[in-house]
A protein has these predicted regions:
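Conserved beta-sheet core of the metallophosphoesterase superfamily
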Residues: 200-294
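Active-site-proximal loop/helix segment associated with metal-binding centers of metalloenzymes
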Residues: 163-201, 254
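Short, solvent-exposed alpha-helical "recognition" segments
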Residues: 29-51
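Short, amphipathic alpha-helical "recognition" segments used to contact nucleic acids or chromatin
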Residues: 1-15
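Short alpha-helical "recognition helix" segments of helix-turn-helix
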Residues: 19-22
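Core catalytic region of metal-dependent phosphoesterases/phosphodiesterases
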Residues: 69, 74-181
């Protein structure tokens, strides 16, 4: 161990500078210089070695928080997963909540074969979705809530264009009207547009590739920048750094059931994404719901 290291250790132990200087055979000025240096350094002993780190300050900062939910597919939602997500929303108090498409399933107007055992009327789907939106507004009375159009929200419109084009342009048959979005102060965003939050572009998405993270990489290659997408029911985060900085790509997961009748053992994960912004710094956290349980910072949410 070097002489300076021994002096630092004695200082850390609380010995007086004069006695340390006398025992070490150095000037008191040298000991005082080392003591001043220790005020602005973090020194961790590692046997014969030392590591010096910059001083750190922890300060609470005002922040903006967005939470993104997608692919709930009401009425085929997982009741426990959705209950846990709403409970977390109540505690997290986001400034922005994005319902990022496929919130309602619209199965009766879909082009795929229907399972008679799962058949439910379109009005029942809309009624249950309206009840969910009312619950969100009650839970987050001051939060900005935005609903982006997914491919399932497009089903009714496409059905009308195919089967009853004369009715397709009727405002009362728009999803905004059918779901009472204005009443619940929820802003509607078309699928051709996106929600902006800090550096992020949030949209339902359309690129589908196998494997976690590959779909969002495809979106980032097409559009660039940081993005959040739904659509594929997977949880994944990737980071790409180029000459413009570091960009985040987020696949948002789902809150629907994980055992649909039309596919076996899907590569899906239940959960949602939280983005915090403060002082130009980005924090992305994905919350994975497992069997109706969510663990965040030591708090276990169970439904």
């Amino acid at each position: 161990m070097t002489l300076d290291a021994r002096i630092r250790r004695e200082l850390a132990a609380g010995r007086g500078k004069k006695s340390i200087a006398r025992d070490a055979g150095v000037s008191e000025w040298r000991v005082r210089c080392l003591a001043r240096a220790m005020v602005t350094e973090v020194v961790l002993g590692r046997g014969e070695d030392e590591i010096r780190l910059s001083p750190v300050k922890a300060a609470r900062m005002p922040q903006d928080r967005a939470i993104v939910l997608s692919d709930i597919h009401i009425p085929h939602h997982d009741r426990r997963a959705l209950a846990v997500a709403v409970a977390y929303l109540r505690d997290a108090k986001p400034t922005l909540l994005v319902l990022n498409g496929d919130i309602v399933d619209e199965a009766p107007t879909g082009a795929y074969p229907k399972d008679p055992k799962e058949l439910i009327t379109l009005e029942d789907e809309f009624a249950e979705t309206r009840a969910f939106l009312a619950l969100l507004r009650k839970t987050l009375p001051k939060c900005e809530i935005v609903y982006t159009k997914g491919n399932h929200e497009d089903r009714l419109e496409r059905y009308l264009v195919r089967q009853a084009p004369e009715l397709a342009s009727m405002g009362r048959l728009s999803l905004c009207a059918l779901l009472d979005l204005e009443r619940h102060r929820i802003r509607w965003v078309e699928s051709s547009d996106h929600v902006a939050f800090g550096p992020f572009e949030i949209s339902h998405g359309e690129v589908v590739r196998k494997g976690g993270g590959n779909s969002i990489r495809g979106h980032m290659q097409k559009r660039g920048g940081s993005m959040v997408m739904g659509h594929i029911h997977r949880l994944a985060t990737v980071m790409v750094t180029d000459r413009f900085g570091t960009h985040y790509g987020v696949e948002n997961g789902c809150l629907c059931g994980l055992q649909p009748s039309y596919i076996k053992h899907p590569d899906w994960q239940q959960g949602f994404t939280q983005i915090d912004l403060a002082a130009g710094v980005v924090s992305v956290r994905q919350h994975h719901i497992q069997g109706g349980k969510l663990l965040v910072d030591g708090n276990l949410y169970t439904a």
